[in-house]
Amino acid sequence: MTLLIQNARCWNGGGFHTADVLLQGGKIKSLGTSISSDGVNALFDARGQYFLIPGFVDVHVHLREPGFSYKETIATGSGAAAAAGYTTVCAMPNLTPAPDTPAHLAEEQAIIDRDAKIQVLPFASITKGRKGSGELVDFEALSPKVVGFSDDGCGVQDEGLMREAMVRCKALNKVISAHCEVNDLLNGGYIHDGAYCKANGHRGISSASEWKMIERDCRLASDTGCRYHVCHISTKESVEVIREAKKSGVPVTCETGPHYLVLCDEDLQEDGRFKMNPPLRSRSDREALLEGVADGTVDVIATDHAPHSAAEKEKGLSGSAMGIVGLETAFPVLYTKLVRTGVMTFEKLIQMMAVRPREIFDLPVGEIVPGAPADLCLLDTDCNWTVDPDKFVTMGRATPFAGWQVQGKNRLTVWRGEVVYEALR
């Protein structure tokens, strides 16, 4: 397959230049001006207006297969990712069975091989059954087949267990991607323990339940040298703990989600589409996260895309399942609320969604140069549209951004040199 993208504003690592880009055999063959279209299978005109960048990478998604295909499938979840401009997603292990043995992992991989629209890289669990306690998995057997290890949805409660996991992952040069939550500090909470919670009679999740585990794990990462990535940070204390750990040379990286950067508990409504874990925190937490983005403490923006059935999300804040969908809203919401308002540069957003995730998880560098993988997306930053969950590709519909007017849309996604999504014509 040979593709030609004409008149694109191409990412060059720190900015953009206008060029034609020829793709052949799954690679970028050449860049230039007025490249001939002779022999090309498909031609796309970016009009000198659209931005061609390395495909987005989401290091935190829940694709729900095997075990929960009534919520999402690998086909629908990866299709949603393709529509949003992602060419790689990393799938969390809260599945049935959990990918805690090579045989269980093979079940998930077989579905990926059959149905994935883009690259789907699985995480294996840290503990057997992804329980956050008990017995560790066979890291050595699983390591060649996974992007990293995570018990996402559960924090590893025992310090000795986490230390051993880090020692073994360090020997394998694998990342531990940690959901940080101290069970003893949850107290049955389901939204942030803030003003809205108290005023409306809800049960709150303390900030300490998150940052205290991060503090413990940063100490363990310092001791062991393990590459330690913190999932979905949401509190100002977490930002500060990670900032200080980085200053001390701890090999720690972290992500936050779009919703934590543009919403806080002042935006809560009595609706399950506002319920996720971690919860929306306070305004001061959101401001601290934005400061962490600005100074590099926060490395990556990941969606924590977590679809549920409609029935599971229609029980208000107290009764609904935790989790929202995020793939198809991430770029437009962030571009509208942060880039358009001057909080963040467009280049910084690309770094956090397309470049830095590749660096942390040892993926091929996202470059638009001859010989690089043809994993690309084409962004229209002028398109204005209304978020309508009924038009999503994902099976999930629960988003706090329903009805928002946003600017920015993906027009084309190419993975391994093949068009996997197009909305140009």
Set out the residue ranges of the language-model regions.
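N-terminal metal-binding scaffold of metallo-dependent hydrolase/deaminase domains
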Residues: 1-39, 50
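Divalent metal-coordination and catalytic microenvironments
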Residues: 8, 26, 49, 60, ...
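C-terminal cap of metal-dependent C-N hydrolases
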Residues: 8, 316-319, 373-425
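Metal-associated gating/positioning segment near the N- to mid-region
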Residues: 50-115
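Active-site mouth loops of central-metabolism enzymes
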Residues: 59-72, 121-133, 153, 202-207
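Alpha-helix-loop-beta-strand connector modules within alpha/beta enzyme cores
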Residues: 102-119, 168-178, 329
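Histidine/acidic residue-rich metal-binding segments in metalloenzymes
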Residues: 134-301
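His/Asp/Glu-enriched, well-ordered alpha-helical/loop segment
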Residues: 199-227, 294-295, 299-301, 306-381
